[in-house]
A protein has these predicted regions:
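Secondary-structure junction motif
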Residues: 165-186, 253-255, 261
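A late-sequence structural motif
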Residues: 80, 230-267
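Hydrophobic hinge/microswitch elements
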Residues: 103-108, 112-115, 122, 180-232
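Flexible hinge/capping segments at coil-to-helix
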Residues: 128-166, 170
Length: 267
């Protein structure tokens, strides 16, 4: 604690530095001069801001407040992120969540520019330094068609399958990039009859007979079991894809973002 001589010494030094009288000393105590009043008004505001910041940081440390911005691709959202978002919100209701719906390239760019705390996206992806990607899970995709494919247990060759109208996510998506490469590896060219913006649009189009499509098995399995669509067995093996966490170590994560990341990695 500061004693009286130390306080007096500090007050004298402050007056010398500012070149004006701040205090009027008398037997009754100390009062502020006009200059002292002006300084006090500014200092008191600064103190209030500092006190509020300390209180806010204390609340963030206790996870009573804070915010997280997550950039996510649609498949990553459906297959991994949604249940974790639910658990996190239930455990830390005071933390605000902001979710950006991006393609993988857009999501990676948002993390690079500091617009998102991190991204949860599907491969293929490019994450160059200072970005870092961590695999969270792998998933398999299958060919899916309407009821006309029911009972066809014999695996089809890819070149025969694509004689049917093909529904796909559009150019610029990692899914389009992935299947372009897969088709080329099998001496074929990806040429969708229908391109859509979101994965949610693929399934209804298949169900209504507009064509066949490739969808994550985890995503479409319940609909197959309900008998609304059919899995089409393929001779060719579709490579597995991954869902990855992308971070930017240039920007230190907030306490809330770090806690969410731990929940995401441990799941």
């Amino acid at each position: 604690m500061s004693n009286q001589p130390n306080i007096t010494h500090f007050m004298n030094n402050l007056e010398n530095q500012l070149g004006c009288k701040l205090f009027v000393r008398s037997n009754r105590g100390v009062t502020l001069t006009a200059e002292g009043e002006k300084l006090y008004q500014h200092v008191s505001v600064a103190y209030q801001h500092l006190h509020a910041a300390e209180a806010e940081l204390a609340m963030e440390r206790s996870m009573e407040s804070g915010s997280i911005t997550i950039s996510a691709s649609e498949i990553a959202l459906h297959l991994l992120l949604l249940p974790i978002l639910g658990r996190f919100h239930k455990q830390y209701p005071g933390v605000r969540l902001r979710l950006l719906n991006h393609s993988t390239p857009e999501a990676v760019e948002s993390v690079k520019n500091g617009l998102a705390d991190f991204a949860v996206v599907t491969t293929p992806l490019q994450a160059k330094k200072p970005l870092k990607s961590t695999s969270l899970m792998s998933f398999k995709e299958i060919a899916v068609g309407d009821h006309s494919f029911q009972g066809k247990e014999k695996p089809m060759r890819l070149k025969d399958l694509i004689e049917n109208p093909l529904i796909s996510l559009g150019q610029g998506s990692t899914t389009y990039e992935f299947y372009s490469k897969f088709f080329l590896e099998n001496d074929l060219v990806l040429s969708p009859d229908t391109e859509v913006e979101t994965i949610d649009q693929v399934l209804p189009l298949i169900m209504n007979g507009l064509g066949i499509g490739f969808l994550p098995e985890l995503f479409v399995r319940p609909v197959i079991e309900e008998g609304k669509v059919c899995q089409i067995p393929l001779k060719e093996n579709i490579p597995e894809r991954e869902i990855c966490l992308v971070e930017n170590h240039t920007f230190p994560p907030s306490i809330a973002a770090e806690m969410f990341k731990k929940m995401l990695v441990l799941k």
